[in-house]
A protein has these predicted regions:
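Right-handed parallel beta-helix/beta-spiral solenoid domain characteristic of secreted/periplasmic
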Residues: 1-43, 68, 73-75, 374
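Right-handed parallel beta-helix
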Residues: 24-35, 58-73, 89-101, 116-136, ...
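Residue-level signal for pocket-adjacent positions within structured domains
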Residues: 3, 78, 105, 128, ...
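C-terminal low-complexity, acidic/polar tails when present
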Residues: 238-240, 250-253, 259-265, 270-276, ...
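Extracellular beta-strand/beta-solenoid scaffold signature
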Residues: 9-18, 39-57, 75-84, 103-115, ...
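Pocket-edge structural micro-motifs
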Residues: 10-12, 30, 35, 206, ...
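Acidic, glycine- and Ser/Thr-rich low-complexity intrinsically disordered tracts
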Residues: 6, 308-317, 321-455
């Protein structure tokens, strides 16, 4: 319907729309914003100011809404950024942001670093070459600022596979470098390959910008009810900035997600589910179905004699392919050796690690063949990873739920219409069983404080 929308386009390299300091209560609705005609190096929409010109909260625009807008770069030369999100109390909903791409610099559909939040990013199409969505990544003009209270829900985050043969600089799909209380739920993340970075689709790495923002943290993040597919690798976690002072990465929960097509042969990279560096604390991974070609977990940091330990790590009730190395840390052996040194005291139980060796891992996990596991799903050929009726994996989780992703929660989270478009089937009713007792007593809790907004 772009032909029916009023169109705003910059005649030069400056934003087509920018807010005045302290602006309040503006709604942009049913508008098209085209590429900046004077150059592809800037923002199309500038909400707030990312520089020292916005050095206190009184100057931050707030109560802004971008609703059902079409925002796009030039198909041939792209655009650096769709929306610069340096405001407060801002919603971006129902909008379509495309052709945000660059061969020479990072390009983002939405990025913010000097706005306090809260932010609602819901029901959008976000297409970019660098980082489709990012918080942090530049020094805030406001001392001590951390973008907070973020809800990122039911978005389609992707890029065209045809860009792979072009020269656009591809980095990741979703990145947090400075953020607090973030809820990421019901999204589709897809089509990501190794290019200007190693290939991880989702990146949580606190960055203090060379010591200029040592307060930067990534904490209290919940990632649930998402589908991540057709990517080179999934998560890259780093406890602290390795290039200067920063705060920590901590309290992250990854629950009830479906990951498939995590394939290094198709997309480059290493096909790893989770790379975890320097020992971030209170990470919980539970009830996920993960079909990947690389490691389950790769840990690094510290030395072989004194690895960087991840305190209160939880990995339970997941279905995953073990592949060659499963859970492995730098300089250590697969399984128990890595767990005892990189994840001391970890709650690692009731997982299905298909193709793994039980002698290398804690008890109360299972290690079927990959062929057997494939037979437990409804139809792997059509990516239907529901457990079939009668499978012994039904209601075998520590909480008496099915191990792996809960399809009812996944479909409710992603939305029925989106689920239908994805080809996700309706969930099967549970099969009554008391074969397993709840063994969660005595286990360390996940220590999660989910994003406060929208719940």
């Amino acid at each position: 319907h772009s032909g029916k929308l009023a169109r705003i386009q910059s005649a030069n390299s400056q934003p087509a729309l920018r807010t005045a300091p302290g602006a309040r209560h503006w709604k942009l609705m049913l508008l098209e914003f085209g590429p900046n005609q004077g150059g592809a190096g800037g923002d199309i929409i500038l909400l707030g100011d990312g520089s020292l010109a916005q050095s206190n909260l009184d100057r931050v625009p707030s109560d802004l809404i971008v609703d059902r807008c079409y925002i796009h770069g030039d198909p041939a030369r792209g655009q650096k950024r769709g929306i610069a999100l340096n405001s407060a109390s801002t919603s971006i909903i129902g909008s379509y942001i495309s052709d945000i791409k660059s061969a020479s610099q990072d390009a983002q559909a939405i990025a913010g670093w000097n706005g306090p939040g809260p932010f609602l990013i819901e029901n959008n199409y976000l297409e970019a070459s660098g980082e489709n969505f990012m918080l942090g990544g530049a020094t805030p003009g406001i001392n001590g600022l951390i973008p907070s209270d973020v809800v990122f829900r039911r978005n389609h985050v992707t890029r065209p596979a045809s860009w792979r043969t072009a020269n656009w600089a591809v980095k990741n799909l979703f990145e947090l470098k400075n953020a607090r209380r973030v809820l990421v739920e019901g999204n589709l993340f897809e089509t990501h390959w190794q290019d200007a970075q190693p290939g991880y689709a989702i990146v949580f790495t606190p960055r203090g910008e060379g010591g200029a923002a040592p307060w930067a943290v990534v904490e209290d993040v919940t990632f649930r009810y998402n589908v991540v597919r057709n990517v080179a690798a999934v998560f890259n976690f780093l406890a602290r900035d390795n290039n200067g002072a920063s705060g920590p990465l901590r309290r992250v929960k990854i629950a009830d997600n479906l990951f498939y097509g995590v394939d290094r042969s198709a997309w480059g990279g290493n096909g790893t589910f989770l790379q975890i560096g320097e020992g971030p604390a209170e990470i919980s991974v539970e009830h996920n179905t993960i079909m990947q070609t690389g490691n389950v977990i790769t840990a690094y940091g510290g030395t072989r004699q004194a690895p960087s330990a991840a305190d209160r790590f939880v990995f339970k009730d997941n279905i995953v392919l073990h592949n060659a190395n499963g859970v492995i840390g730098t300089g250590l052996a697969i399984g128990n050796d890595t767990l005892s040194k990189y994840f001391p005291g970890a709650a690692f139980y009731r997982n299905v690690l298909a193709g793994g060796n039980a002698s290398r891992y804690p008890a109360d996990n299972s290690f079927p063949t990959v062929a057997w596991l494939r037979d437990q799903f409804q139809d792997v050929a059509t990516y239907d990873y529901r457990l079939r009726p009668g499978s012994s994996l039904r209601q075998s989780g520590s909480d008496s739920r099915d191990v792996g992703v809960g399809y009812t929660a996944l479909i409710e989270g992603i939305g029925a219409n989106a689920a239908a478009l994805l080809g996700l089937p309706e969930p099967s009713p549970p099969v009554p069983s008391d074969r397993f007792k709840d063994r969660t007593r005595g286990r360390p809790p996940a220590y999660i404080r989910p994003g406060s907004g929208g719940q």
